[in-house]
Amino acid sequence: MSITSSQLKSWHPDRPVSKGSTSYHNAVVNAPYYLENLDVLVDLVKPKIRDNETVVDFGAGTGVSAMHLLRKLKAKFNLYLVDNSAAWLGKAYEILSNYSNVKFFLLEKKEERYATLAETIGEKEADHVVCANTVHLIPELENTFKGINSAMKQKGTFTFQSGNILRQDRKKGVLMVDDTIIRVHDIALDMISSNDNFRKYRKDIDNNIEKEKEQRKFVFPDPRPVQFYLKSLKNSGFKYENPIYKLIKIAYKDWLDFLRVKRLQAGILPEIGGKEPSPEEEQDRDELIILASNQLFNDLEMQNPMADNKCFTV
């Protein structure tokens, strides 16, 4: 069944905004590294967007990237926020639903996959699709890209970025998101073995490490090389320009705010409490992640050529 513009109905949340989405939003909405990242994306798409065109923010999350687009772009455009998380999109709705040019669309679950963009908003509906900090989380990338291609008008553009893509010529000391997550996880496990404040978690730790592998990879999937993304674009019918790389400094204090988001902690250290920790487990997990993060930051300051006493580089 095809969808026409006149049939498009904006999604509305059916529940209050979740604490998890608010916590994540607050951790990144004013973080300099996050905004600098978005600045690069907006600068790339700004010359391409004209009045009355439709821009899709794919993987819009809690609305931070959409806020940036609305604030930075002078063109009078229609903005569609699309995400597969009702919780995340609900936060974006809370912030941006008063904008007359903004609509919201939830990617519905279809058996083992989510609906494509074309299945959600229709074919040849979007002039431009932008995607911030999302593509590295998508398992079926080629199918997703094909859905984006089908949803775009002729001569439309698709622009995405991520801080978690592998590339061979990365400068020594430049990290990815995943590098810090793995290191914090490993340091925290060592602390369980050495710090008696957490000795109650030692007994089942080996079993929990094995049991929670899938949860860790669900929240923080293994990074894929840039060539994988370029091949997926080509196989999905896109022509692409050469990727652009930019180094960004992340302050330790800002990154700690990110690492303390409870929903993310369920992927950073799920061996303590899993997806549904008790209040005590949640508190202990947070304390462990704080301690492990501070040790990581100290190690980076002392050993990483792209870090100093305030920040590291991605």
Where are the predicted features?
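Class I SAM-dependent methyltransferase SAM/SAH-binding core
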Residues: 56-58, 62-117
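Short alpha-helix
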Residues: 221-236
